Amino acid sequence: MIAVIVIAGVVAVIRASGGGTKIAGRPASSGPTTTLRDGAVAGIDQAPPATAAPPRPAASAPVALAADPTAAADQLAIAEVTIREPNASPNELDAAAHLQQVAYRRLGQHPELYDMIISRAPAALRTAVAHNLYARNDLALIPGGPLKDTLPAWRIVAPARQSELLADYRDAQQQFGVGWNYLAAINLIESDMGRIEGLSSAGAQGPMQFMPSTWDSYGAGGDINAPRDSIMAAARYLAHNGFADGNVDGALYAYNNSQHYVDAIKDIAAVLALDPFAYRAYYRWEVFYVTTLGDVHLPVGYDTPERIPAADYLAAHPEAG
């Protein structure tokens, strides 16, 4: 078994006070993965399909999310289009991914607004927006205890290169029959694609959050903290639990014993299968930790060996609130 219920990555970070509300109507998954004949992943190695009459692309500088939900939904739509713009600069992608992440974190807490939010997106992107909203809702429903007024004993580091992680996901898919998009989704939720270094409250470790005893069985002698070794071990574990034989839900549930976790992974994987260009946005998502004082941004360079008061950190770093 991997980390049960409490995860050190995005699950722990994105949970909102009061939890979420289980909602129906999740869009159908579009299959394990989407690949091209030559082995390239559609949308990453080739230009994404154009959307009809897209809004003007997002600015390259960070933009604050509007307080009005409709205006925020319009900003999210612009960010989603920019992410899929083949000529978007790295700065534009950074800004769009940040706005996208903040929008889903905030708007995702309000299922009563989902229909409105989805309708504001271009038609070609509405399924992806719906999957992201449902994933946010499911992550909020994973039990994790009361919110704390302290920040975790973590070290936040830059992730491995986007291309290197993608190559690792692909290699694992080829070797073990586990879709690259599922591995990317797990890596995102467990450790924000390797940004979080530190133990979960359950004692799980590394980019894919293995318990040491499970690592002994599936790590193949590798380094639990090495991205490639951890990704390969996750694929090995999922394959052992039936993923490659079609038991996707069962394999994911074995990885983390929560149906909400399973559903969230499947939603994110579905976005990547529908349009893998979305990967370059997920790769840019940063670490936020929910406290009694609200979301706190933990940037690369955050490093504390023990929990610290959130109020003290925010006083020293007001931009993190």
Provide a role label for each language-model segment.
Residues V13, G18-R26, R56-A59, V63-A66, ...:
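N-terminal export signals and maturation junctions of secreted/periplasmic proteins
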